[in-house]
A protein has these predicted regions:
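Extracytoplasmic/secreted envelope proteins and their assembly/folding machinery
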Residues: 10-14, 37-44, 99-103, 141, ...
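Sec/Tat-exported extracytoplasmic proteins
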Residues: 12-13, 17-21, 43-51, 106-113, ...
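Low-complexity, Gly/Ser/Thr/Pro-rich intrinsically disordered linker/tail segments
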Residues: 154-171
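Active-site-proximal alpha-helical
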Residues: 67-157
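Short, flexible loop/turn segments with low-complexity composition
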Residues: 56-62, 116-122, 170-171
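Zinc-dependent metallopeptidase catalytic helix centered on the HExxH motif
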Residues: 1-69
Length: 171
């Protein structure tokens, strides 16, 4: 349908934007898949909500048979790479799980007195600029810490405390 086509364009164009900001550092697959795909999925959802009053991610996240919040929150490292991201019943939860992690990151930034708008700017823009300043093959974690003011292990520890009931807080 037309709406789905437009939302896919937003999603894929955002990947072009990420690549441009990071000077193609994404292509070395040394950037976290959850931030790459999750950021694009969240932006796609913002677009759908703003222009079409649709919020597909909310429904996706509520379907516990398609993805496991416990797995996402307890094993986020699995979502760093495409080949380790879990699949459930043939459903590739690159998008749901990754979007959940991104929304949890935004929520954690808000807890640090960062406005929602600024938190999304950090996720959608600043991280990728920081990533672009690093040499090819360089670990993404220093860029994460420089951008978000916490280490990846610190964020994963915070993420580990999220439960299904916390979905309302981040949606």
């Amino acid at each position: 349908n037309k709406i789905r086509t437009y939302s896919v364009i937003v999603h894929e164009y955002f990947h072009v934007y990420q690549r441009a900001l990071s000077h193609d550092k994404i292509l070395d697959r040394n950037s976290p898949k959850w931030l790459f795909e999750g950021g694009a999925k969240v932006l796609e959802e913002i677009y759908l909500k703003q222009y079409y009053k649709k919020y597909l991610l909310k429904n996706d996240l509520k379907q516990s048979d398609n993805w496991s919040i416990k797995r996402v929150s307890k094993e986020p490292k699995l979502y760093e790479k495409y080949n380790t991201s879990p699949q459930k019943k043939g459903f590739d939860n690159n998008y749901s799980g990754s979007a959940f992690i991104v929304l949890a990151l935004v929520n954690e930034l808000k807890k640090n007195n960062i406005s929602e708008e600024k938190a999304f700017e950090l996720v959608f823009r600043e991280f990728w600029i920081q990533r672009g300043k690093q040499p090819q093959g360089w670990n993404w974690q220093p860029s994460f810490q420089n951008t978000f003011g916490m280490t990846v292990p610190e964020f994963y520890e915070r993420l580990s405390k999220y439960k299904r009931k916390d979905l309302k807080k981040i949606l």
